[in-house]
Curated annotation (Swiss-Prot):
The protein's role, per its UniProt record: The RuvA-RuvB-RuvC complex processes Holliday junction (HJ) DNA during genetic recombination and DNA repair, while the RuvA-RuvB complex plays an important role in the rescue of blocked DNA replication forks via replication fork reversal (RFR). RuvA specifically binds to HJ cruciform DNA, conferring on it an open structure. The RuvB hexamer acts as an ATP-dependent pump, pulling dsDNA into and through the RuvAB complex. RuvB forms 2 homohexamers on either side of HJ DNA bound by 1 or 2 RuvA tetramers; 4 subunits per hexamer contact DNA at a time.
HAMAP family associated with the record: DNA_HJ_migration_RuvB
Species in which this protein is naturally found: Campylobacter jejuni subsp. jejuni serotype O:6 (strain 81116 / NCTC 11828)
Oligomeric and partner information: Homohexamer. Forms an RuvA(8)-RuvB(12)-Holliday junction (HJ) complex. HJ DNA is sandwiched between 2 RuvA tetramers; dsDNA enters through RuvA and exits via RuvB. An RuvB hexamer assembles on each DNA strand where it exits the tetramer. Each RuvB hexamer is contacted by two RuvA subunits (via domain III) on 2 adjacent RuvB subunits; this complex drives branch migration. In the full resolvosome a probable DNA-RuvA(4)-RuvB(12)-RuvC(2) complex forms which resolves the HJ.
Protein name: Holliday junction branch migration complex subunit RuvB
UniProt-annotated binding residues for Mg(2+): 66
Amino acid sequence: MDRIVEIEKYSFDETYETSLRPSNFDGYIGQESIKKNLNVFIAAAKKRNECLDHILFSGPAGLGKTTLANIISYEMGANIKTTAAPMIEKSGDLAAILTNLSEGDILFIDEIHRLSPAIEEVLYPAMEDYRLDIIIGSGPAAQTIKIDLPKFTLIGATTRAGMLSNPLRDRFGMQFRLEFYKDSELALILQKAALKLNKTCEEKAALEIAKRSRSTPRIALRLLKRVRDFADVNDEEIITEKRANEALNSLGVNELGFDAMDLRYLELLTAAKQKPIGLASIAAALSEDENTIEDVIEPYLLANGYIERTAKGRIASAKSYSALKLNYEKTLFEE
């Protein structure tokens, strides 16, 4: 799905996002409660000369889980090794990663909910006892070899905390859920990022981009890059509200942050007249896979009250009808 408001990382974004990513808590905007607690835990671990306990970050994509992992690495003065669960296909893959860690290293696993049960079994003793149990052979002749590992901190990131097994989730001593950002926070992020791109972004322009960014920093930064293109073509060093509006309208992102796919989704639900539509039916109608709908399209709509998710399916709320400028008919239960 080729969308400018796509939340998943694009490969070409990696270098760009890294250059705009804050390296310490002083430069990190938002998630104040999480920052406050992490600062305490990091200071305590450094005072005791210990590794941090294992950390789990959950929440919608694009809110800064990877950024926080890198900041923790910086604040702890530790090396960080990054991977993603889909890349760990066999227990041997995980064993190779773990045995290459040094004392005090941080291992960051993105999409950790996608680890297979067999991989999780290898991870349990590594997290609890800093030990790797390797089974040699099979059947009655099988032997278990125990390998000691250096003490390390595992940081897991997930958009679906509910898909983690209880044994894995319980092994994380610190668990934080990242929340969507306020427009004012995103505007500050955008103005700081614009300076790194050798531009000045007016406050009104930053707020205009922010309110169309689905409360998500990754989307806000991606939109900023596209707005910058419009400014560059017009030889403008300052990004104005007028230029931001022109660029965003040209990109097909409306004032609510919806693009064509969001509008198709909401039109499908509102056309059902308050009858729930199942996920499989929505996926078929939109020609999208169910994971994309659950992980990319729905989180923002759910968080902002545009849709309701029931046991029977999805229902458009009154807010959706208003967004599409449609009349909303109350159900018998609402009257």
